[in-house]
Amino acid sequence: MNRIDFEAHYYFPALMDYFSTRTDYPMYDRETKTFRRSGDFTLKHPYRLTHLEESLEERIKMMDEHGVQMQVLSLSSGVDFLSPEESILWCQRANDYVYEGMKAYPGRFQGFAALPVVDIDASLKELDRCMEGFRFVGWLADSNFGSSYIDDDRYFPLLEKLEQHNGALYIHPTQPIDERMTGLGPQLAAAPFGFGIDVSIALMRMICKGVF
C-alpha cells in the first residue's frame, strides 16, 4: 500500500454537536443529515456526512479495504464562518483531534492545519503549534475567505510563516465571491461549476500578485 489520500476531510462529534445547536449558518440538522454553510452551500447527503463523521478506527478499516496507506486529514468547511473566538477554539480542537489520530495510528494519518483566518495573530500561533508541535504537512486554505482572496496583503504573514516551516499550501475550492453565483443553489455555486472557477481565480491572483 503506497496510496496517499490528501482529499480526506473530516468532522468530529463535538463540532457537529455544536453545529446542531446553531440557528444561523453554519448549522447542522442531525435528523436529516443536512449541513448548511450558507444559502447556496447546502450538503444534504447522509452517506457522505456519515463518512465525514466516522471515527478514526472506521477510517483505518476503509483505508485498508481500498489500499490507502495514509490520509492527510483536513477539517471540512464551517469553522471559518464562526466568530473569531469560536473559530479559534474549534480550530484548536480540530488540530488536537488530528494529532491524537496521528499518535494512535502512526504512519496512517497526517494533517493539514485548520486556521482561524478571521484572526491572523491567532492563526500564526496555531500554525506554529501545528507545524512545530504536531509536525503537520501544511495548511489547507479555501480559495477565498468570503470577502477576500489569499493574495490579500493581510494573509502574507501566514504564507511567510508557512514557507518558514517548509509547509505545503493546499488551495481548496469553495464558492466564488460573485453575486452571479448566488441564488441558484450548489449546482451553480459549488462543485459542478463554481469550485473550479474560484480555484482558477485564486491561483491567477496569486501569480499576478507575485506570491509565486
Language-model features, listed with the residues they occupy:
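Helix-coil boundary/capping segments in enzymes
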Residues: M1-F212
